[in-house]
């Protein structure tokens, strides 16, 4: 099973640290964040695909000399493609059910359970959601009986459909990646998921 980790961002909020080191290689308790993410993956994920833009040479060099116990494929972006475009750029390495992570996610989610839940529901996509007190700075999700019915981007205060936000962790079938347009800068969260609600089953955990 593959996992895609989206590590193409510029890390502007962490400057000046990211002026010289790409954000995925910044240490989190003495281990680069992306390596920590890889080492925490379930054993069933044996291949990790890194969608990389900024800091490509440093990422290539790091994983050339570092054994993380899994096959690592680095897929370069000539220019940032957004979350959806980056996933599409990795499509040729996807063979089936795939876990996808935003590159700055440190999660307590039990991924084995999430994968099994996804398969038991025969879903095309399963999204991890997180409950927050103030969802207005985020995209929120409306649920009915566990199924995602609507996405709402940064709702005005008092107009929120819920207080559940996207946690940046997905289990996806190849059908979802296949409908992303090629060679476009596109957001999976804002441009793709809202369009497929009702056509391809999206659920939450």
Sequence positions of predicted segments:
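Residues at the starts of beta-strands that form the adenosine-phosphate
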Residues: 2, 46-48, 71, 124, ...
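Generic beta-sheet signal
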Residues: 6, 28, 51, 75-77, ...
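A structural signal for short hydrophobic beta-strand segments in well-ordered beta-sheet cores
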Residues: 25, 140-143, 193
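Active-site phosphate/pyrophosphate- and oxyanion-stabilizing loops and adjacent acidic/basic residues
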Residues: 39, 88, 190-194
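Conserved beta-loop-beta/alpha segment of the NTase-like Rossmann-fold superfamily
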Residues: 59-145
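Catalytic-core segments of class I nucleotidyltransferases/pyrophosphorylases
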Residues: 98-99, 106, 112-119, 133, ...
């Amino acid at each position: 099973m593959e996992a895609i980790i989206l590590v193409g961002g510029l890390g502007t909020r962490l400057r000046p640290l990211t002026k010289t080191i790409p954000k995925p290689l910044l240490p989190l308790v003495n281990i680069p964040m992306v390596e920590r993410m890889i080492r925490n993956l379930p054993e069933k994920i044996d291949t990790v695909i890194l969608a990389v833009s900024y800091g490509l040479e440093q990422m290539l060099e790091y994983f050339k000399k570092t054994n993380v116990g899994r096959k690592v494929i680095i897929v370069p972006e000539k220019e940032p493609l957004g979350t959806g475009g980056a996933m599409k750029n990795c499509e040729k390495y996807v063979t089936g059910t795939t876990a996808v992570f935003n590159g700055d996610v440190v999660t307590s989610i039990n991924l084995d359970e999430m994968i099994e839940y996804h398969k038991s529901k025969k879903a095309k996509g399963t999204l991890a959601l997180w409950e927050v007190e103030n969802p207005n700075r985020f995209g929120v999700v409306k649920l009915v009986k566990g199924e995602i019915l609507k996405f709402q981007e940064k709702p005005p205060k008092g107009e929120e459909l819920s207080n559940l936000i996207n946690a940046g962790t997905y289990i996806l079938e190849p059908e979802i990646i296949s409908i992303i347009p090629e060679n476009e800068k596109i957001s999976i969260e804002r441009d793709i998921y809202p369009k497929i609600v009702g056509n391809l089953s999206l659920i939450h955990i």
